[in-house]
Amino acid sequence: MIGFLQGYVVSLQQTSTHRTLLTLDVNQVGYDLYVPSRIRQHLPPDQEQMRVFTHLQVREDQMVLFGFAVVAERDLFRQLIAVSGIGPQLALALIDTLGLQDLVQAIVNSNTKMLVKTPGVGAKTAERIALELRSKLAEWRDQAGLKTLPSAGPIDSVQEDVEMTLLALGYTSQEVMRALQAVGQNTALAKNSDTEAWIREAIAWLSQ
């Protein structure tokens, strides 16, 4: 088993199949690792080494390394691929789309509407992920030291309208999710079914 690799980042590129590939120079040996694109946020300055936590997948025809900036992401990845029908690329897509904290929160809360925002994840797959992992992740989240956030966001009757409006204004789905999660911490707003109020608060947060 390879727990982690530490070396210099040679390149970070998008492959023809839309995967993110990191090449790491470890003692003059180049390792190619498939990584979440979010790893860009953790890249070190030039001439500094980076530690990447790894998962090794052994196939009949090849060995594939997956890399993560933090060990909790790697551990979550391993739990995701243990779910029937969830392969490594879909697990990476889940982590990339929602991020560590929001993904764990969505699974623990059985928030399938959040999970299906990931390309390739349909309603049945989202339900299966939540069913198989919510109890495990609720316990693991505490052990991993992840923050427990209150459930936040518009009530179901207005959520779709709010999201569609913000997306139409040019915000990405990730920006929209984070904005609604952030402004939803406002107790009064969380109980508000006024679509316009949610949109105003979200835009104000995104404009900071």
From Swiss-Prot:
SMART domains: HhH1 (SM00278). Residues 1-69 are annotated as: Domain I. Residues 149-159 are annotated as: Flexible linker. Gene3D superfamilies: 5' to 3' exonuclease, C-terminal subdomain, DNA helicase RuvA subunit, C-terminal domain, Nucleic acid-binding proteins. Keywords: Cytoplasm, DNA damage, DNA recombination, DNA repair, DNA-binding. It is found in: Cytoplasm. SUPFAM superfamilies: DNA helicase RuvA subunit, C-terminal domain, Nucleic acid-binding proteins, RuvA domain 2-like. The keyword Cytoplasm applies. One of its GO terms (cellular component) is Holliday junction resolvase complex. GO terms for molecular function: ATP binding; four-way junction DNA binding; four-way junction helicase activity. Residues 159-208 are annotated as: Domain III. Residues 70-148 are annotated as: Domain II. The keyword DNA-binding applies. Has three domains with a flexible linker between the domains II and III and assumes an 'L' shape. Domain III is highly mobile and contacts RuvB. Homotetramer. Forms an RuvA(8)-RuvB(12)-Holliday junction (HJ) complex. HJ DNA is sandwiched between 2 RuvA tetramers; dsDNA enters through RuvA and exits via RuvB. An RuvB hexamer assembles on each DNA strand where it exits the tetramer. Each RuvB hexamer is contacted by two RuvA subunits (via domain III) on 2 adjacent RuvB subunits; this complex drives branch migration. In the full resolvosome a probable DNA-RuvA(4)-RuvB(12)-RuvC(2) complex forms which resolves the HJ. The RuvA-RuvB-RuvC complex processes Holliday junction (HJ) DNA during genetic recombination and DNA repair, while the RuvA-RuvB complex plays an important role in the rescue of blocked DNA replication forks via replication fork reversal (RFR). RuvA specifically binds to HJ cruciform DNA, conferring on it an open structure. The RuvB hexamer acts as an ATP-dependent pump, pulling dsDNA into and through the RuvAB complex. HJ branch migration allows RuvC to scan DNA until it finds its consensus sequence, where it cleaves and resolves the cruciform DNA. This is Holliday junction branch migration complex subunit RuvA. It comes from Acaryochloris marina (strain MBIC 11017).
